[in-house]
Design a protein with these regions (language model features):
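A hydrophobic/aromatic-rich effector-binding and dimerization subdomain
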Residues: 2-24, 75-144, 163, 167-173
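Conserved short histidine dyad/triad with adjacent acidic residue
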Residues: 22-38
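Intrinsically disordered, low-complexity acidic/proline-/asparagine-rich linker or regulatory tail/stalk regions
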Residues: 291-296
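Short, Lys/Arg-enriched, Trp-marked, Pro/Gly-tolerant hinge/linker segments that flank
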Residues: 117-128, 143-197, 201, 206-212, ...
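Short acidic-glycine-tyrosine-enriched beta hairpin
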Residues: 57-71
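Short, conserved beta-strand element in jelly-roll/cupin
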Residues: 36-53
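Basic/polar phosphate-binding segments, predominantly the helix-turn-helix DNA-binding elements
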Residues: 166-169, 196-198, 202-240, 252, ...
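Solvent-exposed, amphipathic alpha-helical segments
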Residues: 49, 131-145, 187-198, 242, ...
C-alpha cells in the first residue's frame, strides 16, 4: 500500500497499488472525524452497530445493514459513540474517470434516493442495492482471507461494482455550482493544513486570514460557506477529535489531555463535548472501557 499523510481536513487517500482504490474493514469503538473532504467517492456499508454521518446540510444515522455514499469533494464528518463494524470503500475520481469520462459531473446515490418510485420500481431498487452490498461483502471476504488469486478476484469484483455504480446509481449531472465549490475548497487547503498543525494553540482571526490571503471579515464568511461551520467551531472540532482519542486510548487525566490539545476553557469544552457525544468525558471513558471488553 502506498504510504501517504492523511490530514484531518483534506484527506489524501492511501491507495492499494494493485487496485487503485482503498477498501478495508473498519472496527470502531468510538471516534469523531471532523469535517473533511477528498477527491473520491466514499461508500460506507455498516455491518454492525451505529454511525452518524453528516454531509454538508444533511445528517443521517446509519444502522446495521445500511449503506451510504458520499460524493467526491463533499465536506462531511462522522461520529461513532457505540461500537461498529463497517466496510469503507473509497474510489478516487481520477481512477473512475478513466472508465466513466463524465464521472466528475455525475451524481451518485445509493439508498434514500429522492425519486418518487412505484412499487415495482421500488422493488427493483431494493434488489439492486442488495446485489451491490453482496458484491462489497465478497470483496471484503477476499481482502480478509487473501487467497493467492486475491488481486485478480478483487479487481474482477471491483469493475462489476463500478459498472453497477454507473448503471444503477448515477442520477444525472451536477450543477455548475459544484465546480465552484470544489475551487473554493482548494483555496482552503493551506488554511486547514495550518489549523491542523497549530490547533493546540490560539490562532487569531488576523493570523489565519493572512494564511488565506483574505480580509478577516471576508474570510469568516468564506470559511462558513465552504465548511458549514465557523473557523472557531472548526478549530474546536479538531481539538475535540484529538481529545476523544486520548480519552479512550490513554489513562491520562482529563486536565492533562485538555492542556495537550489547547482547550483552555473547560466550561466551553464540556458544552461542546456534550453536544457531540451526548455524554461527559468521564462517561465516555467509562463506557468505552466496557465496550472494548466485549466483542461486536
Amino acid at each position: 500500500m502506498k504510504k501517504v499523510i492523511t490530514a484531518s481536513n483534506y484527506e489524501v487517500i492511501p491507495l492499494d497499488l494493485r487496485t487503485n482504490v482503498r477498501f478495508y474493514t473498519s472496527v470502531d469503538f468510538g471516534s469523531y472525524v471532523p469535517p473533511h473532504w477528498h477527491d473520491a467517492i466514499e461508500i460506507l456499508y455498516l455491518q454492525e452497530g451505529e454511525l452518524k454521518v453528516n454531509t454538508e446540510s444533511t445528517s443521517r444515522n446509519l444502522h446495521s445493514g445500511q449503506c451510504t455514499l458520499i460524493q467526491p469533494n463533499k465536506v462531511h464528518s462522522t461520529l461513532c459513540t457505540r461500537p461498529n463494524k463497517a466496510i469503507v470503500f473509497q474510489i478516487p475520481l481520477l481512477f473512475l474517470e478513466k472508465f466513466v469520462p463524465d464521472a466528475s459531473r455525475l451524481t451518485f446515490q445509493l439508498e434514500g434516493t429522492p425519486r418518487q418510485a412505484s412499487q415495482p420500481e421500488w422493488d427493483r431498487q431494493k434488489t439492486q442495492i442488495n446485489q451491490f452490498k453482496e458484491k462489497l461483502t465478497q470483496m471484503q471476504f477476499i481482502m480478509d482471507t487473501k487467497p493467492d488469486e486475491a488481486p485478480l478476484m478483487f479487481n474482477t469484483l471491483l469493475f462489476d461494482v463500478l459498472y453497477q455504480l454507473y448503471h444503477n446509481f448515477s442520477f444525472g449531472f451536477t450543477a455548475d455550482s459544484t465546480s465552484r465549490q470544489n475551487q473554493n475548497l482548494e483555496k482552503l487547503k493551506p488554511v486547514l493544513d495550518y489549523i491542523n498543525c497549530n490547533y493546540n494553540r490560539a490562532i487569531s482571526l488576523t493570523e489565519i486570514s493572512r494564511i488565506a490571503m483574505f480580509d478577516p471579515k471576508y474570510f469568516c464568511r468564506f470559511f462558513k460557506k465552504c465548511m458549514g461551520t465557523t473557523f472557531l467551531e472548526y478549530q474546536n472540532d479538531i481539538r475535540i477529535s484529538h481529545i476523544y482519542q486520548d480519552l479512550v486510548s490513554t489513562n491520562d487525566k482529563i486536565s492533562v489531555i485538555l492542556e495537550r490539545h489547547g482547550f483552555t476553557n473547560y466550561k466551553l469544552f464540556r458544552k461542546v463535548f456534550y453536544e457531540h457525544f451526548g455524554a461527559t468525558p468521564t462517561e465516555v471513558r467509562k463506557n468505552n472501557s466496557v465496550y472494548q471488553k466485549t466483542t461486536l
